[in-house]
Design a protein with these regions (language model features):
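Conserved C-terminal beta-signal and adjacent last beta-strands/turns
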Residues: 389, 503, 534, 617-721
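Membrane-embedded beta-barrel scaffold of Gram-negative outer-membrane proteins
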Residues: 317-333, 337-345, 501-502, 527-605, ...
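Outer-membrane beta-barrel translocator/receptor signature
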Residues: 158-160, 170-251, 257-263, 312, ...
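Acidic/polar loop-and-plug regions of large Gram-negative outer-membrane beta-barrel proteins
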Residues: 235-239, 252-321, 334-367, 408-430, ...
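Gram-negative outer-membrane beta-barrel transporters
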Residues: 451, 553-555, 569-654
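Surface-exposed extracellular loop regions of Gram-negative outer-membrane beta-barrel proteins
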Residues: 274-288, 397-406, 479, 488, ...
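Structural signature of Gram-negative outer-membrane beta-barrels, strongest in the C-terminal barrel
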Residues: 256, 367, 386-398, 432-556, ...
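Acidic, small-polar-rich N-terminal luminal/periplasmic segments of exported/outer-membrane proteins
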Residues: 42-195, 536
Length: 721
């Protein structure tokens, strides 16, 4: 069955179930809680630690992060029992930071940098100095699986948590669709709550972006075994970028069934984002030094440019307890993305004066994805040793279709943009470009010794990779088929109750290359590239706060065309780093969230001798973040908030001759939780880039960069009914 047909079937099922359950939850809801404080806490906070690998972990004191996270096939694990560096940002944090997208949330993580553009149409990231999500195949996981999260941009309306596993995750998640190895970003979807919820949030952002978000949750049935949750939002108006308009519509529904042994859930997402004057990144001509950044408010693209992105996704998941210690689980779902735009591509800066050259185009992209998995999880003991064993099979498929009609060259300037007459271009014919299939089988076992004070996780995955590229005539122009075996070794040692020492060796997998037609060995295929990580760390939990110190090294090989005309695996990037993260309530009423990452990136191997030993593109020496909250003693419910983001200088070419300056962004805000006519209400105000600093940010792996945020005011009001 084609990918689109499978997705359509899942969507129809979701809508039928939603319609059938509508009468049970359409009644007016009672307030989720009578206290104003309830609105400032994560709605799914629980009173005890989670019981199993699929239960939502509880939050750390202060509610900013959870004390556990999803590790793919390993399920949810407590941070102190995890041989990895992982952070899970809660729904409370997403709301209090007034995030709109997942990229907004991850700005606060010292190991992550967003490489998308302010006012752009795609979100992408660097994690531990490696790119994620730069292509047309989305690399965000959804409920622990690839192929479901929206392809180009994920919004936080449907996110209960946003999790970041730092470092390769090929064994736990399978190979990333676009071969990212720096980490895994996972969206934990909002699911029906135990208590009824009716919550509305109204929002405003500079210049005239106005929006509303409705979050409704109900349970029904004799034992409340059925649940439904709806999240819907609309936003629209002028953005903080001059002459740019943006309209967004998001709808998400989650259904579940919680029986004694059987548990089922069904998620459906539909979203559309439209821009007039969407921003695009820049590249720099050779031998030109990076000019000073323009103000982020300046509209650089042509005003007549536009873009429309539509995405639909569905995921069906379930698990059944064969016994108290043996559970079978499965997922099936997929996504469809449709993009069309008439806009700049990637303008090139030609000189120090900021003159640019660009060829606009009419672009269409269609991406179909499907995913399925099935697994078995068992818990047992062999003498004094406990085991948690998981066996899992996965299959992911995607198909990319594309069409482009180019216009004529436009000359402009980043400081004094030139408005040109609108170009009339015909809509392109969309042709199939590529398709791929990623399938694998994995086995893991976590062994517990000495009452779980020592935990050893061992795993192995056999990953099969198959891809095909198509010519304009619709015939296969190249084919790739290969496989790789990737291991996992993780160790956790708890010498004291509040300290965990950990180590991991884990690999990331990337699709092997096919030598290009310009090489003397054209058509030769290469085995999947295996990136290798060694990580050593310590985690300390003291009452209401937690800190993690990690040392890591990741080595990522790749192919290059040599001076002799032979394409081979002769390039390697090695990133070494130290990460320090702090989360939680460091004193009564005072909360911190942030840390610092020190990176030592190096091109250890290269076909170009002059580049060996240079720094990789987009990898700074220092990344630092801090977000603080202070509950004032003079007014109950009133909180001062603020923070800073610092990124050291970054090269935009491998020759290390072109460099972006370091930058710092300061944000500040306030929050007030109270009751209005008996309804819990939270008012928020935030100013991003308080000092309106002008800077370049977001360096992609191919050397593109863009202006940073202008000063932006955000306001919101959340009311529980």
């Amino acid at each position: 069955m084609p990918v689109a047909s499978r997705l359509t079937l899942a969507i129809r099922t979701a809508l039928l179930l939603a319609a059938a359950s509508g009468n049970a939850w359409a009644a007016t809801a009672e307030s989720a809680d009578d206290s104003a404080q309830s609105l400032t806490l994560d709605a799914t906070n629980v009173n005890a630690r989670y019981l199993g690998p699929t239960d939502l972990p509880e939050v750390l004191a202060g509610g900013q992060v959870a004390r556990g996270a999803r590790l793919g096939m390993l399920g949810n694990k407590d941070v102190m029992d995890t041989p990895f560096s992982v952070t899970s940002y809660t729904a409370k944090t997403l709301a209090d930071l007034q995030t709109v997208t997942v990229a907004d949330a991850l700005e606060r993580d010292p190991s992550v940098r967003s490489t998308g553009q302010t006012g752009g149409i795609v979100d992408s990231f660097f994690v531990r100095g490696f790119a994620i999500g730069e292509g047309n195949l989305g690399e965000l996981a959804y409920d622990g699986v690839y192929g479901v999260a929206p392809n180009y941009r994920a919004f936080t309306e449907y996110a209960e948590r946003v999790e970041v596993l730092k470092g390769p995750g090929a064994l736990m998640y399978g190979i990333s669709p676009n071969s990212g190895v720096g980490g895994v970003i996972n969206i934990v979807p909002k699911r029906p709550l135990d208590q009824d919820l009716t919550r509305f949030t109204g929002s405003y952002a500079s210049d005239t972006q106005v929006g509303g978000h409705l979050d409704i949750s109900r349970r029904f049935g004799e034992e409340n075994q059925f649940g439904v949750r709806f999240n819907g939002s609309l936003q629209g108006g002028d953005t903080a970028v001059d002459d740019q308009q943006r309209d967004v519509g998001v709808g998400a529904i989650a259904l579940d069934y919680r029986g004694e042994r059987l548990r089922l859930n069904l998620d459906y997402i539909s979203q559309k984002e439209s821009f007039e004057g969407a921003s695009r990144p820049f590249t720099l001509a050779p031998s030109v030094q990076v000019p000073s950044a323009p103000n982020g408010r300046t509209s650089l693209p042509q005003k007549w440019g536009w873009s429309d992105t539509k995405e639909q996704s569905a995921l069906l998941g379930g698990e059944y307890d064969l016994s108290d210690s043996l559970t079978v689980f499965a997922h099936a779902g997929g996504g469809r993305s449709d993009v069309k735009r008439l806009s700049d591509q990637v303008p090139r800066i030609l000189n120090d004066a900021g003159d640019t050259s660009n060829i606009p185009g009419y672009y269409k992209f269609n991406v179909d994805r499907s995913t399925a998995d099935v697994g078995l999880r068992a818990q047992f003991a062999t003498g004094p040793i406990t085991h948690t064993t998981t066996l899992m099979a996965t299959r992911y498929q995607d198909e990319l279709s594309r069409g482009i009609n180019n216009g004529t060259e436009i000359r402009s300037n980043i400081y004094h943009p030139v408005d040109t007459p609108k170009q009339t271009l015909r809509a392109p014919k969309v042709l199939r470009i590529s398709e791929s299939e990623l399938s694998g089988v994995a086995l893991t076992d976590t062994l517990g010794f000495l009452d779980e004070r020592i935990q050893l996780t061992l795993g192995v995955r056999r990953q099969d990779i198959e891809s095909r590229n198509y010519s304009a005539a619709g015939v296969v122009s190249s084919r790739y088929k290969d496989a790789a075996t990737t291991p996992l070794v993780g160790v956790v040692v708890k010498p004291w109750d509040d300290v965990s020492l950990y180590y991991n060796y884990v690999e990331g997998l990337s699709k092997g290359d096919i030598a290009p037609g310009t090489a003397s060995n054209a058509g030769e295929t290469f085995a999947p590239y295996e990136s290798k990580q060694h990580e050593l760390g310590v985690k300390y939990e003291h009452g209401t706060f937690m800190t993690t110190l990690a040392l890591f090294q990741i080595e990522k090989p790749s192919g290059e065309l040599g001076a002799d005309g032979v394409y081979s695996v002769q390039a390697e990037q090695r990133n070494r780093g130290v990460e320090l993260s702090v989360y939680g309530e460091v004193a009564p009423g005072t909360r911190l969230m942030g840390g610092v990452t020190l990176l030592d990136g190096e091109l250890t191997q290269s076909a170009t001798a002059a580049n060996r030993g240079n720094k990789p593109v987009g990898v700074p020496d220092i990344q630092a973040n801090l977000w603080a909250e202070y509950d004032t003693p003079w007014l109950e419910g009133f909180t001062l908030t603020g923070g800073a983001i610092y990124t050291d200088s970054q090269y935009i070419n491998q020759a290390n001759t072109q460099e972006l300056d370091a930058w710092t962004r300061i944000d500040a805000g306030v929050r007030y939780a109270t009751k209005i006519e008996g309804r819990p209400t939270t008012l928020r105000a935030t100013v991003q880039n308080v000092f309106d600093r002008e800077y370049w940010s977001g360096v992609a792996s191919y050397g593109a960069f863009s202006p940073g945020y202008p000063r932006t005011l955000q306001l919101s009001a959340t009311v529980d009914f």
